[in-house]
Amino acid sequence: MPNVTKKLGLNIWLENDIVDFEQINENFQKIDDCVICTESGIKTASYSGGVSGTANWRYKKYSDGTIEMSTKLEFTNIKCNGGSKAPYYSGSSTVQFPFSMSEVYDVQMHLASNTIGWVSDITGKSVLDSVMFRVMAMEYEDDYIYKQVYITVKGVIDNV
C-alpha cells in the first residue's frame, strides 16, 4: 500500500512500488471531488435609494455552484438625520447583485465612518437579487460625512 498525502489523502508511490491503477483512479476521483474556483473577476451593478451609483463587485465562482461576492461603497452624500432620537438613520439604499441567484445564505455588512455608527441590513428574507441597507448613527448629522459600506455575500448562482 502506498503512502498518502496529508491534505487530500492521495496515493503516492516509490519507484519500486507496483502501481495499482485502481488507486490512481481513486486519486483522480478525490481531485475531482474538490471544490475549486472556476472564475473570478469584477462585475458592476447599480445601487439606488438614499444614495445611488455603481458598485464594483469582486467575485469568485466555485465548481459546486456557489459564489462569494464583495463590494465597497464610498459615500460623501449620505447623512443620518432620520428619526426623532438616537439611533438616527439614513435613507434606505438597494444594491443589486451582478448575478442571478437561487439562494443567498450569508450577508455581512460593515461601516467605516468618522462618527460612531453601524450599517443595518434591512433586506427582505426571500430577496435574491439585491441587498438593502441603512446607515445608523448615535448623533444627528446635519452635514454629509464620508462613509464606506463593505458588503460580502455568499450564495448559489442560477447558471453554473
Where do the model's predicted regions map?
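Extracellular "spike/adhesin" assembly and maturation modules
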Residues: M1-I36
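Intrinsically disordered, low-complexity regions enriched in Ser/Pro/Gly/Gln/His and often acidic
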Residues: K6, F21, S40, S48-V51, ...
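Conserved beta-strand and immediately adjacent loop positions that scaffold enzyme active sites
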Residues: D20, W57, Y150-T152
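Glycine-rich, low-complexity segments
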Residues: E26-S70, V160
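Extracellular attachment/recognition segments
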Residues: T66-V160
